[in-house]
UniProtKB/Swiss-Prot annotation:
Catalyzes the attachment of alanine to tRNA(Ala) in a two-step reaction: alanine is first activated by ATP to form Ala-AMP and then transferred to the acceptor end of tRNA(Ala). Also edits incorrectly charged Ser-tRNA(Ala) and Gly-tRNA(Ala) via its editing domain. It catalyses: tRNA(Ala) + L-alanine + ATP = L-alanyl-tRNA(Ala) + AMP + diphosphate. It comes from the Bacteria. It comes from Neisseria meningitidis serogroup C (strain 053442). Binds 1 zinc ion per subunit. PANTHER family: ALANINE--TRNA LIGASE, CYTOPLASMIC (PTHR11777:SF9), ALANYL-TRNA SYNTHETASE (PTHR11777). InterPro entries: aa-tRNA-synth_II/BPL/LPL, Ala-tRNA-lgiase_IIc, Ala-tRNA-ligase_IIc_anticod-bd, Ala-tRNA-synth_IIc_core, Ala-tRNA-synth_IIc_N, Ala-tRNA_ligase, Ala_tRNA_ligase_euk/bac, DHHA1_dom. This is Alanine--tRNA ligase. Keywords: Aminoacyl-tRNA synthetase, ATP-binding, Cytoplasm, Ligase, Metal-binding, Nucleotide-binding, Protein biosynthesis, RNA-binding, tRNA-binding, Zinc. The gene is alaS. GO terms for biological process: alanyl-tRNA aminoacylation; negative regulation of DNA-templated transcription. GO terms for cellular component: cytosol. It is found in: Cytoplasm. Its cofactor is Zn(2+). The keyword Cytoplasm applies.
Amino acid sequence: MKTSELRQKFLKFFETKGHTVVRSSSLVPHDDPTLLFTNAGMNQFKDVFLGFDKRPYSRATTAQKCVRAGGKHNDLENVGYTARHHTFFEMMGNFSFGDYFKRDAIHFAWEFLTSPEWLNIPKDKLLATVYAEDDEAYNIWLNEIGMPSERIVRIGDNKGAKYVSDNFWQMGDTGPCGPCSEIFYDHGEEIWGGIPGSPEEDGDRWIEIWNCVFMQFNRDEQGNMNPLPKPSVDTGMGLERMAAVMQHVHSNYEIDLFQDLLKAVARETGAAFSMDEPSLKVIADHIRSCSFLIADGVLPSNEGRGYVLRRIIRRAVRHGYKLGQSKPFFHKLVADLVKEMGGAYPELKEKQAQIEEALKNEESRFAQTLETGMALLENALAKGGKTLDGEIIFKLYDTYGFPYDLTADICRERNIELDEAGFEREMEAQRARARAAQSFKANAQLPYDGQDTEFKGYSERQTESKVLALYKDGEQVNELNEGDSGAVVIDFTPFYAESGGQVGDVGYIFSSENRFEVRDTQKIKAAVFGQFGVQTSGRLKVGDSVTAKVDDEIRNANMRNHSATHLMHKALRDVLGGHVEQKGSLVTAESTRFDISHPQAVTAEEIAEVERRVNEAVLANVAVNAAIMSMEDAQKTGAMMLFGEKYGEEVRVLQMGGFSTELCGGTHVSRTGDIGLFKIISEGGIAAGVRRIEAITGLNALKWAQEQERLVKDIIAETKAQTEKDVLAKIQAGAAHAKALEKELAKAKAELAVHAGAKLLDDAKDLGAAKLVAAQIEADAAALREIVTDLTGKSDNAVILLAAVNDGKVSLCAGVSKPLTGKVKAGDLVKFAAEQVGGKGGGRPDLAQAGGTDAGKLPEMLVSVESWLCQKLS
């Protein structure tokens, strides 16, 4: 049975059982910021199980795309080396939302697996596990299914705590949870391994093929299991594992889907086809996850999901290199994947060209540094030793684009350990250099006396240019070699240099022989732009003809935020008053930060009105026009100008319909609608009369809104509120209750401490004229005071010093019986003690308190009190 046929059979079976076939959700869980990628069939129904969402059906079945790479669920390092680990897999599932429960779930699974009409798997090849306390599921298997008792395994709390078990599922520390029953398939006696729960359970003989989760409890904060009014079912059957069963093979990579992909990998890499070659399996697996991620909108980048994708692509390319393929090949496998899976997932075919282009671009980018990076690594490994130096790991990462786990992958093949601590030191040093980067930016005053730069970036993102000057370590040089950090000056540039609050562009300067990664652009002189970065491959020389290309994604984000800043500036003046003036700004791809003159905090109502006005302008989608004109003509337009700013005879006026007119030399969107969405995320004071506002736009604003929505839903669930309106009342009631409990707890602690203090007095050291108690106990500052007061009141000649440590801080309390205060004062004692533990304090002759910071000095200080007291008494 082919994998595609098995997928269809599963969905058809459950459709005949009254289930609605629901399309796979995206690999990017847009409604759940807690997840990096969709990794289970139930992810898209999470809100249904939690009661936040209601569907028009109570039974559902899906074939869900899943990715496990990065984050908590990360199978990346095992992929290619085991029979069943994948970065991408399909999870078949059937779900009941308060409809059927254990009996039907188990019967459905059994019928699909064993019925001659469906899979017809021999019954004696199957085994079931149940949670040890789930007699209901056990009896269904035994009495209704007819499974022999020796093939029903009870699994208890085998993970170290109550309800922490392979056979007990929970969504989190609180919330829906319940026992589960797993079905295992026996691959035969010739395969090593034992049944679940046995010492040999990790072998490959008995493989889990289906898991039925029975959500029947709601776990509260106290750990109580409260029965759900409508129990639900969440099941999962791994498609690749089941295909291996149906095709009578022992590895997922032997199934038809992977066999065709493996042959395609061998074809494109020129390698011999062999099931013993891990690199073939790595690439076959990775083309699936990479293609599906790109189809769902993820693109290679240096952060978040995009960086996980980049790591997977580069791991695949490296394994191709290992097989002898140094030319781009990975993108050519997309067509083979579309042939295999495009029928079930039409988005693959619809976006085939986009997937191929994204993979080819990333592959080509990495190919330029892969060979030199591998040479560096091979040289380092050839020197011998059991550990690869952290400095080498960092250079591979920083200069050659090797993700840490890619280097780890290579070293694992050679049984070489990684100097992780050394790598982290280098990373921290880089972060420190970044913080000090201003010393190598615009104000570096690099020596230059050549021609000016002609900026083409308003209309062009790519230019053909000539290298006019090169810099390394602040000095002019004739060439930059691979790995060198420096600056490049070219005659025509598309790169915007940092100015007017907008950060400099990034991108690449390259030719067929070399590549320079532009990480910042600054003005060396008023009309001379310096592109700062790293020579990642080849040698760049003065006079070279090169192509200069801006990073489109980052430029577009900068433009959205800059244009939004203009609209916000106008809206702030309209809402707050004409006194508002710009005091500073920072426009980056992530956000816009805007400082204004305003005497008090901007209210929530004022912020909402500013947001409304800006988004109104965005929705109007008016054209954004720029014109060069004389200062006199610019003033006639009513354009806003910054007080104290120096302008030339000619200025650039930026106009956004009737919404904003302002002088600006920055890069901007073509129409206001390109901004997408505008949201202010923070407001606060940074100096007297100056407020700072931070805002985001586009997809960043959408993501922020979704995260806030998710947070509200989580709060509703956590507080068990019925609606959003009830949340505040619930929180206030909870806070009041907690405060009352804290008071009761403090009172109880004080009473206990007083009782414990009585024994301290019994054990006091008798110095003749006084009885001394100097001890460390467990109590807070208030309890210390109560104990000391109680003890000094019970004796005519007691000198008490008690210490406690809470949250790393020292609390001290000294007390002296009143008849003794003529000779010994509590204030003097506590001052003496506090100085030794890094603190100070004082108080009355009979009672004094202090604090300290050095808890390590407590034992020594407590010993010294006796000699101090003896001197006072003598």
